[in-house]
Amino acid sequence: MSKILIILPTYNEAENLKHIISQLRDLNLEIQILVVDDNSPDGTGQIADSLTSQDLFVLHRAKKDGLGPAYLEGFTWALDRGYDFIVEMDADGSHLPAELESLLKAANATDLVIGTRWMPGGKVANWPWYRRAISRFGTSYAAMVLRLPYKDLTSGYRVLSKQLVRKVLEANIQTHGYGFQVELVLLAHESQMVIAQVPITFLERSKGKSKMTGRIVVEAWLKTTILCVSRLLNRR
């Protein structure tokens, strides 16, 4: 039986963590959970510690250092313990645990499954128009300049094979924010790995504060542009 690990990066998710953990535990799936907390001042790390058991583990990081580094540390932890599939998932309730099974089914024949908002069957609930516009423009821009045929490059609900995770760690990706997700897909695509897209429903958080900032958006845009230029130069 495949070993499956869900990685939940957290920063100030005290209002959401117990609920998402409870929902995951209610699934009839053989899964384990790793909370990677960036020293949340609201006590998220301590809440995670109180929930530890045979199916839940916690990594405490010294400071808030971004999504990418949190996942990279979680990936290393997962490979060291022999997991076959690693799930990326938000801890704020935006990603529905009930949809995890459909992603895992697709993972049996692929290296990367992208939970996709912007495809038939996918949708976004409770987002203002400007958040939709930023997300649609960002993923469309990245897909265009990087020539990638995927509909949701910044999606944070994914399943990765251990082979892809190993490649990601070897690549030493430096991006901290959502650009990390774009770079990960590019790496999988250029490595000729099998990639699938599965529709998901994305819910805007009802508690806590979004981590999306102008700085994160700019970093993702700049990183995508740099990756595009780098690819063009390497072809010469």
PLM regions: where:
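Hydrophobic/aromatic residues located in beta-strands of well-ordered beta-sheets
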Residues: 6, 33, 58, 86, ...
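Acidic helix N-cap motif at the loop->helix transition within catalytic regions
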Residues: 15-19, 42-51
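Short, well-formed alpha-helical segments that are part of the catalytic scaffolds
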Residues: 12-26
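Short loop->beta transition adjacent to catalytic acidic/histidine clusters or analogous donor-positioning motifs
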Residues: 2-4, 25-35, 43, 55-56
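Short beta-strand/loop segment that forms part of the nucleotide-sugar
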Residues: 8, 30-40, 59-60, 89
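Acceptor/aglycone-binding surface of glycosyltransferases and processive sugar-polymer synthases
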Residues: 57, 61-80, 85, 97-178, ...
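Hydrophobic helical membrane-anchoring modules
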Residues: 1-4, 145-148, 170-236
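A conserved acidic beta->alpha catalytic loop
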Residues: 37-46, 93
